Curated annotation (Swiss-Prot):
Any one GO MF annotation of this record: unfolded protein binding
Protein name per Swiss-Prot or TrEMBL: Chaperone protein DnaK
Disordered: annotated span: 578-604
This protein's UniProt keywords: ATP-binding, Chaperone, Nucleotide-binding, Phosphoprotein, Stress response
Residues found modified as Phosphothreonine: T174
Organism: Carboxydothermus hydrogenoformans (strain ATCC BAA-161 / DSM 6008 / Z-2901)
Disulphide-bonded residues: none
Positions with biased composition (Low complexity): 579-592
Amino acid sequence: MGRIVGIDLGTTNSCIAVMEGGEVIVIPNAEGGRTTPSVVAFGKNGERIVGQVAKRQAITNPERTVISIKRHMGTNYRVKIDDKEYTPQEISAMILQKLKQDAEAYLGEKIEKAVITVPAYFTDAQRQATKDAGRIAGLEVLRIINEPTAAALAYGLDKEGEQTILVYDLGGGTFDVSILEIGDGVFEVKATAGNNRLGGDDFDQRIIDWLVENFKKEHGIDLRNDKMAMQRLKEAAEKAKIELSGVLETQINLPFIAANQNGPLHIDVTLTRAKFNELTADLVEATMGPTRQALADAGLKPEDIDKILLVGGSTRIPAVQEAIRKFFNKEPHKGINPDECVAIGAAIQAAVLAGEVKDVVLLDVTPLSLGIETLGGVFTKLIERNTTIPTSKSQIFTTAADNQTSVEIHVLQGERPMAADNVSLGRFTLTGIPPAPRGVPQIEVRFDIDVNGIVHVSAKDLGTGREQSITITNTSNLSEAEIKRMVEEAERYAEEDRKRKEEVETRNQADSLIYQAEKTLKDFKDKANPDLVARVEKAIAELREAMNSKDVQLMRAKMEELTKPLYELTSSIYQQSANQNQTQTGTNTQGNVYDADYKVNDDK
């Protein structure tokens, strides 16, 4: 089995890690960073830019830059660039492809298998969409694991004794809280809760809204209509939020943000930590609801928690830490890196699957209840939330009308009593039921949830033995043919990226060779053979012309044609120089002879 990597595919940043010689290492990207911004941009010529470079150009290219795509996973959302629409899976695949390529360059080998993390509260549709993104990027996703569980693995792998830990995971776009019991290599999730629409982006948005409203009051201009201005505000808000974790106030300075008849307008305001806390107080409180829910589901009180792990960059916000400190009456544990621990945990799970790490058992749970719609639009649960996975459960149902020959099984996920208020995972129909009075046929509905948290459902008529099943695989609205097309497209773009990189590198080499040749001519033209000088000048001109094309082979051929006469030219110059030196010093046939004065000391 080849190397299996662990990937934290985040809303704001992503991270990749691998087990190397018994230790997990976080793999730096091509730019040298340990995390990669989850940003994808499209250049004017259609080229794809991912990561730090994409984030840097976002201000000047906001309409062709995609951020926080994870928030749309498992939905019908589409990103339109030029005349082409992209699914969240395709955009996520571009981020995964960047991580994969950088890891391959770092490790010097192909990466084909991965463990990818998702928020614990991700639905089946969102989990399946994440698997699809992995496939499009050319990765076999061996396991999907929950982010808080991965963080617990990173924390607890080398810990002895039993502990009850709570993982508070506030990322860029999602919030999860999980309670685990760990000890003797067993990591058992007792309860999980969360909110898939709450994260650091929402804290940024509060600052943006505050800036926009103040500017509108002062100047009567609504900056929301200016995409470039909004991108500048987003970057400034994120920067201010980060700075306020370390200082009590920060300056937000955005010159030339807009203009009116009197000239350019600027933003230059001071944001204090107290004001930021006021703007975001309800967001902090919103994280405490799921925290209380998880404790209640696990049958625990705050004092029963031994350690609180903070995961995700947003947990650096002082108000968040204070809320946790106040609720649990203890300091949260700060011994793990909140940006990297999820990828590290995924790499540990990858090493477990590869057989490199022994005696580790991971028992995760399903975050939401699963069931079907029954008579009257009621949601009937078959598997309760926080059930350990993998698991299976069956229940007998019957027909609602006389002589009913088919039943539609509507599969749902959620906690609300009515079917319409929950997430629909899919529908399928069991046909061929013999006509009978209502209540007579017996239909067994069976749910199976695999280790990835992905659902398989079957319905069987116990009278005839007829069975129909569905694996909830197309909840992300991608057919197998679409996924295959996207995989091929991603491979084609990877090849185009490779060619583009090769072209740039060859162009740089050619440019360097021309510089070297021209410098040599400038320094030694008077001393050189005129024929050689003419050949070098001709070769330089031809190489310059070749550089105007995108033909790598032509550039290389012309570089070769320049290298030969340039080598002859420099060799002849060195030979001339050597001959001159020899003439000046003369030729000595008796080896090295030295003239020396000497003095005889007479001790007599």
